[in-house]
Amino acid sequence: MNLYDLLELPTTASIKEIKIAYKRLAKRYHPDVNKLGSQTFVEINNAYSILSDPNQKEKYDSMLKVNDFQNRIKNLDISVRWHENFMEELELRKNWEFDFFSSDEDFFYSPFTKNKYASFLDKDVSLAFFQLYSKGKIDHQLEKSLLKRRDVKEACQQNKNFIEVIKEQYNYFGWIEAKRYFNINVELELTQREIRDRDVVNLPLKIKVINNDFPNQLWYEIYKNYSFRLSWDIKNGEIAEFFNKGNRALGWKGDLIVRMKVVNKVNKRLRIFSSFFENDKSKLWFLVPNDKQSNPNKGVFNYKTQHFID
């Protein structure tokens, strides 16, 4: 099954048709209306996150045409196979020189303390949306905290449903759609010998994290040493998606999406070839005010000035 199959579309579907199909399926499988549809909801969101972006769609379409890749993914659950071979090492290996990579702009993200974007993080809303997404309700203590906000309180006093107020006030479906910004997309160079010998390949990465209990609501980086044993039948252009191995914040987790590149000689083992996080730091888990709407968040952190906003 490929991404078009998940959205019940032919591979010739346009961006407009993809958006229409996504909205239709999202309503059908959303956890709020279909308690058994949460996994399908995640899958169609993953599919939409790639196919709705013209650049990602073009890359994915080209990958479908590489060798017999399209036939393979229709007849084999690749993600299951990759996860069986996937390992996460908990300790750093001394021979992995992360400082060597840190100077490579194509490899690591720029520090958040140096970015030029002003993004506003609202921890309570992020947690509320994660709880709605994962279990369809908001914890009592968090609900009490949100009800103290003037805009929420005033809306609820007009006999509006609390959850619907939160969704509407802070654009729940926009945030769900933006989940793709937590994915990490990489290209991995492999040789035929490594594939034949089923070598173990290491993927050292820096992951962006905000923990639920992180007091200052600031991003920080952690090193993760991912590795997996290669399968003997890897083809050039094949995609492996490791769920929940990407960037993460306040319960939300992105995916690690790896595109295999078979080469005669490895020149650069690992390359981040697409990162929404680098292109736009204002999307996920952030509500950025515009000319028509003032910032409704309280006590939030401005990444441009590095200060909290009263």
Swiss-Prot record:
<dbReference type="InterPro" id="IPR051948">
    <property type="entry name" value="Hsp70_co-chaperone_J-domain"/>
</dbReference>
<dbReference type="InterPro" id="IPR036869">
    <property type="entry name" value="J_dom_sf"/>
</dbReference>
<dbReference type="Pfam" id="PF00226">
    <property type="entry name" value="DnaJ"/>
</dbReference>
<keyword id="KW-0143">Chaperone</keyword>
<dbReference type="InterPro" id="IPR001623">
    <property type="entry name" value="DnaJ_domain"/>
</dbReference>
<dbReference type="GO" id="GO:0051087">
    <property type="term" value="F:protein-folding chaperone binding"/>
</dbReference>
<protein>
    <recommendedName>
        <fullName>DnaJ-like protein MG002</fullName>
    </recommendedName>
</protein>
<dbReference type="GO" id="GO:0051787">
    <property type="term" value="F:misfolded protein binding"/>
</dbReference>
<feature type="domain" description="J">
    <location>
        <begin position="1"/>
        <end position="66"/>
    </location>
</feature>
<dbReference type="InterPro" id="IPR018253">
    <property type="entry name" value="DnaJ_domain_CS"/>
</dbReference>
